[in-house]
Design a protein with these regions (language model features):
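Bacterial N-terminal signal peptides
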Residues: 1-7
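Intrinsically disordered, low-complexity terminal tails/loops enriched in metal-binding residues
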Residues: 12-154
Length: 154
């Protein structure tokens, strides 16, 4: 019991340190104002979706979100996950598998009325599991509260 009490504060500090790193590194990679947008990480039976929605329909922020996700989708299709690695850390769950499995999945960019999204789709079950792990890690780091709110079918 005493060990649990000692370990918990360290876990909270590690989480805080991770949050701080994500905020600092995210602002260096993402050109839009994160306080004006919400990240959503939505798993599906065949992969998942990363969606960024601008809160107040600000056209400048929407354009910045779209430019960012268009660029990220092109990188992901090539197996380049350097931006998520920089933002979340190189040990991010699922990251290595996604980078090495780019030939076994399709990556699609699409615009939404208030932002944009990227879909990651595969028929390879281990890769789908890696996508889910990667989405869950982003959900934890961004604390968006959107994981599993929608189980999209692709």
């Amino acid at each position: 019991l005493a060990l649990g009490l000692v370990a918990f504060p360290f876990a909270v500090r590690a989480d805080d340190a991770q949050q701080n790193m994500v905020m600092e590194h995210g602002s260096q990679v993402m050109p839009f104002d994160e306080s004006q947008a919400m990240h959503m990480f939505l798993p599906s039976a065949t992969g998942g979706v990363v969606e960024i929605v601008v809160h107040d329909m600000n056209p400048t922020q929407i354009a910045l979100v779209r430019a960012h996700l268009l660029q990220e989708a092109a990188k992901f299709a090539r197996g380049d996950y350097s931006d998520p690695a920089y933002i979340h850390g190189k040990t991010m769950p699922g990251l290595v598998q996604l980078a090495s499995g780019s030939s076994r999945m399709s990556v699609h960019y699409f615009e939404t009325p208030s932002g944009a999204a990227i879909t990651l789709v595969s028929t390879d079950q281990p890769l789908i599991t890696a996508i889910h792990e990667w989405l869950a890690a982003q959900e934890r780091d961004h604390k968006s509260g959107q994981m599993n709110h929608c189980d999209m079918q692709m």
